[in-house]
Amino acid sequence: MYLFFDTETTGLPRNWKAPVTDLNNWPRLVQLAFLYYDEKGNKINGSNFIIKPDGFKISTEVSKIHRITNERALSEGVPLKSVLDNFKNILSQSKYLVAHNMSFDEKIIGAEFLRINMTNGLNGKKKICTMEQSTNYCKLEGPYGYKWPKLSELHYKLFKTVFEESHNAEVDINVTAKCFWELKKINVL
C-alpha cells in the first residue's frame, strides 16, 4: 500500500540540514493532503486538511504563495492532533511513503509529531521521493550536474503538458501520484 503526502507550511527552514528535533528550525504545517493507493494503483481514499494555527501565525507573505491566510486557517482549520491522528491511522497501514521532496515533507511532519508528543510514524517506512528518483530521467542541467526536477518539470517530461505548481497540497499530491504511477509504468521506479 502506498501513502502519498504533501505539505504546505509557514515558510522554509533556516537550515536544511538541521535534525527534525530542532523544532525552532522547521516551519509549521499549514496544509496536509494525502492519498492512499493499493499496490495496483487504485486510489482507496484521500484527505486534505488545513491546520488550525495554535501557537503560530501564517504570514501574509507566505499566504500569497499557498493562498491560505491566517484568518482562513482559523475559521476552516482542524486541530493539528486530529489531523495527525487521521494521518497516522492511514500511515500504519502503509508499506511505502511517496512524496515529491520527501526530505522536506517528512521533516515537517516529523517536527509536528514531536511538537505534540506523538511518536513519529514515518520512521521505519520505505520512502520514495519522486523528485530525487526522477533526476536522471528528467536530465535537467544544473550547476553541479543534473538538478532535482520541480513537480511541474517532471509532469512536463512525462506527459508533455504544462502543470503550473499550485502550492496547494491537494492539487500537488494528485499530480505527484499521477507522475509516480507513470514512472512505475515506464520502469523508472
Language-model segments: which ranges?
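Catalytic-core regions of hydrolytic enzymes
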Residues: L74-Q93
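Extreme N-terminal starter segment of soluble prokaryotic enzymes
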Residues: M1-L3
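Short acidic, Gly/Ser-rich segments with clustered Asp/Glu that frequently serve as metal-coordination loops
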Residues: T7-N15, V20
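Metal-dependent phosphoesterase core characteristic of DEDDh/y 3'-5' exonuclease domains
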Residues: N15, W26-N70, K88-L189
